[in-house]
Design a protein with these regions (language model features):
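Terminal amphipathic alpha-helical/low-complexity segments used for targeting or macromolecular assembly
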Residues: 1-44, 84, 117, 135, ...
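Left-handed beta-helix
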Residues: 43, 48-49, 54-55, 62-63, ...
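A short acidic, helix-capping loop that chelates divalent metal ions and anchors anionic groups
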Residues: 100-103
């Protein structure tokens, strides 16, 4: 039996809601809505529909970057993501915390900066007041509680420097 690819592609494989969701939340449409709420989003940016962004006015993303599915950007403080950066699915970017030295636990809003050409792999946690240097790779499931140097590869809980990232020519 041969597979009929054309028939399969024309068949409705998803619920009507899934098709409506895909139309309503295309990258361009979602980016436009985020911009209307104050986000600064570059050209050719892909932000998946299941991404949660708490405060669009505290978000800046450079050209050609992508934010994966089910990513949580808790941006009480400003979150800046550089150009050609990839934030994979289910990443938690947490630009909010509390001052645990104060009995009242006041809310703090430190910034997070993610550099150009970085790759934040799936299920990673980026803590408050962290800078991910240009070209760095943060391995899947990593917990970042300290800055990452440019062009470094990091992994683990807590994150540890693994090696230098060297691009092939």
């Amino acid at each position: 039996m041969e597979l009929n690819i054309a028939e399969n592609r024309n068949h409705l494989n998803y619920s009507k809601w899934m098709y409506v969701k895909r139309i309503l939340w295309t990258f361009g449409y979602r980016n436009t809505i985020l911009r209307l709420f104050g986000a600064k989003i570059g050209k050719h940016v892909h932000i998946y529909s299941s991404t949660v962004i708490w405060f669009p006015w505290n978000l800046e993303i450079g050209d050609w970057s992508a934010i994966g599915e089910e990513t949580l950007i808790y941006n009480l403080g400003k979150v800046t993501i550089g150009e050609k950066a990839t934030v994979s699915h289910r990443v938690h970017v947490c630009a909010g915390t509390h001052d645990y030295t104060d009995p009242a636990l006041p809310l703090l809003r430190p910034e997070i900066r993610i550099g150009n050409q970085t790759w934040i792999c799936a299920n990673t946690f980026i803590g408050p007041d962290i800078e991910i240097g240009e070209g760095a790779v943060i391995g899947a499931g990593t917990v970042m509680v300290k800055d990452a140097e440019p062009w470094g590869v990091y992994a683990g809980n807590p994150a540890k420097y693994i090696k230098k990232r060297i691009l092939k020519k």
